[in-house]
Amino acid sequence: MILGPYIAVSPLIVISLGGALLMLAEAFSHRREESHDRRSGPSSDMALGTAITLLAGAVFSGAVGFVGPETLEGFDSLAPYLVMDRFTLFFSFVLCLGGALAALLAGGYLPEHRLDRGEFYPLLTFSTVGAIILAGAGDLLTLFLGLETMSLGAYALTGFRRTSPRSTEAAIKYFLLGSFAAALLLYGGALIYGATGHTDLAGIGEAIAGAKGAAAPNPALLLIGAALVLVGLAFKVSAVPFHMWTPDAYEGAPTPATTFMAVAVKGAAFATLLRVLLGAFGSPALSSWAAGWPPAVAVMALLTMTVANLIAGRQESVKRMLAYSSIAHAGYLLVGVAATVRASEDAQASVMFYLLAYTVSTVGAFGTLILCGSRGAEAVSYEDLSGIGKRHPVAALAFSLFLLSLAGVPPTAGFFGKLYIVKAAMGAELYTLSVALLLNSVLSAYYYLRVLVYMYMREPAPGAPIARPMRSGYVNAALVVSAVLVMVLGIWPTTSLGIAVRAVLASR
């Protein structure tokens, strides 16, 4: 079938063409310096165009991966460089969905905060393209290409508020630490190539396993290279102790950019982490509990969720608290990654479902934070949310739903995400990590419920400005979609989990 490979990469083609059109629209548009109606400024049309582009990418990902035929000729035509299998297409759907919702949030946020510059949207679109390439990378060179394409856009989005010293500082920190992590990953890849003679993940795995008469790789080069690659990817998923950039970057960036980084950058990094660990490093030489990567991932999981939850409870900034919450969720996901050694299919599917549930819950939480801000000012502290439950009950109810999902309270999507992770960990006999995850979930309830206390049980301080949530159709649309998906995934979780299992089995 001649069109096979083009059908497989159709999400990338659609998003890339849409991003190019967005750049042209921005370049040739005649923008007004100041719009009389800030909600109909130049970014409004760009936000809608970006959301449509990324939703089209999500539709193509779902149609090609899960509605089309069980087998598609040409799926492996781009291998080993880019593997557009059902595993990649599942993540492509999640990444496009997260990017589209972030674009809708930006459509309301940017004009409100006088950041109405259209270049935000092409940056977000092409960063999503890089994220999909990263998720489907079957070669270390493609992995690095996707990583940098995604990261360069994320760096620019972090510093998008150019007049803010905090935003500039956050962007510089993110860029410097991100470049250092990328250099470590690149050097690790070079060492792995020197040890195995391969850059494709399948070839690396065969060389390590000694398949097809391959010469035994140099163990010292291999271990050092694998460790450096793991460190580089741990930085992208915000695992402790490589998380220091996350709170500053998330707090300093415009909130829609923070949302995109929290869902798309993290999601793509976990996709490639699974592919690298189970593909290139899946042989017994590197996947044993005695001398392989599972102990390192397990320790990172334990540290990440515990340290992040302890620090999150001490924050006075709600946005910074959500940043540490994002780090804690990376720890929960790492528990699922560690479980893939002994319960591969169930653990991978649980990670994929958790990322979908985490994406819609996180978008909703940051989106409601945008909505609860006063006109032209963000809701930053807990005090800023005082009394929201009485003055704006719908916004408070939405925020409560998303926070309860992040806390893992039934019947939300977040509850079943954690349930499936714990089930996979128990099946892999990771009892310590399972108990630690449950205890950390209880610990996280403190800072999530603290927000509810301020919204429903506290009154604003005397003389404090009364918050008047913005009226934005784009933000409201993103919140409605997120809320519906949180409840749908919570009421019918087995459907999405079954799709994830199909994706895992089809990628083998």
Swiss-Prot record:
<keyword id="KW-0472">Membrane</keyword>
<dbReference type="GO" id="GO:0042773">
    <property type="term" value="P:ATP synthesis coupled electron transport"/>
</dbReference>
<dbReference type="Pfam" id="PF00361">
    <property type="entry name" value="Proton_antipo_M"/>
</dbReference>
<dbReference type="GO" id="GO:0048038">
    <property type="term" value="F:quinone binding"/>
</dbReference>
<keyword id="KW-0813">Transport</keyword>
<feature type="transmembrane region" description="Helical">
    <location>
        <begin position="87"/>
        <end position="107"/>
    </location>
</feature>
<keyword id="KW-1278">Translocase</keyword>
<dbReference type="GO" id="GO:0050136">
    <property type="term" value="F:NADH:ubiquinone reductase (non-electrogenic) activity"/>
</dbReference>
<comment type="similarity">
    <text>Belongs to the complex I subunit 2 family.</text>
</comment>
<keyword id="KW-0520">NAD</keyword>
<comment type="subunit">
    <text>NDH-1 is composed of 14 different subunits. Subunits NuoA, H, J, K, L, M, N constitute the membrane sector of the complex.</text>
</comment>
<dbReference type="GO" id="GO:0005886">
    <property type="term" value="C:plasma membrane"/>
</dbReference>
<feature type="transmembrane region" description="Helical">
    <location>
        <begin position="396"/>
        <end position="416"/>
    </location>
</feature>
<feature type="transmembrane region" description="Helical">
    <location>
        <begin position="260"/>
        <end position="280"/>
    </location>
</feature>
<feature type="transmembrane region" description="Helical">
    <location>
        <begin position="351"/>
        <end position="371"/>
    </location>
</feature>
<feature type="transmembrane region" description="Helical">
    <location>
        <begin position="175"/>
        <end position="195"/>
    </location>
</feature>
<dbReference type="InterPro" id="IPR001750">
    <property type="entry name" value="ND/Mrp_TM"/>
</dbReference>
<keyword id="KW-0812">Transmembrane</keyword>
<feature type="transmembrane region" description="Helical">
    <location>
        <begin position="291"/>
        <end position="311"/>
    </location>
</feature>
<feature type="transmembrane region" description="Helical">
    <location>
        <begin position="321"/>
        <end position="341"/>
    </location>
</feature>
<keyword id="KW-0997">Cell inner membrane</keyword>
<feature type="transmembrane region" description="Helical">
    <location>
        <begin position="126"/>
        <end position="146"/>
    </location>
</feature>
<feature type="transmembrane region" description="Helical">
    <location>
        <begin position="479"/>
        <end position="499"/>
    </location>
</feature>
<feature type="transmembrane region" description="Helical">
    <location>
        <begin position="220"/>
        <end position="240"/>
    </location>
</feature>
<keyword id="KW-0874">Quinone</keyword>
<feature type="transmembrane region" description="Helical">
    <location>
        <begin position="2"/>
        <end position="22"/>
    </location>
</feature>
<keyword id="KW-1003">Cell membrane</keyword>
<protein>
    <recommendedName>
        <fullName>NADH-quinone oxidoreductase subunit N 1</fullName>
        <ecNumber>7.1.1.-</ecNumber>
    </recommendedName>
</protein>
<feature type="transmembrane region" description="Helical">
    <location>
        <begin position="431"/>
        <end position="453"/>
    </location>
</feature>
<keyword id="KW-0830">Ubiquinone</keyword>
<feature type="transmembrane region" description="Helical">
    <location>
        <begin position="47"/>
        <end position="67"/>
    </location>
</feature>
<keyword id="KW-1133">Transmembrane helix</keyword>
<comment type="function">
    <text>NDH-1 shuttles electrons from NADH, via FMN and iron-sulfur (Fe-S) centers, to quinones in the respiratory chain. The immediate electron acceptor for the enzyme in this species is believed to be ubiquinone. Couples the redox reaction to proton translocation (for every two electrons transferred, four hydrogen ions are translocated across the cytoplasmic membrane), and thus conserves the redox energy in a proton gradient.</text>
</comment>
<dbReference type="GO" id="GO:0008137">
    <property type="term" value="F:NADH dehydrogenase (ubiquinone) activity"/>
</dbReference>
<dbReference type="InterPro" id="IPR010096">
    <property type="entry name" value="NADH-Q_OxRdtase_suN/2"/>
</dbReference>
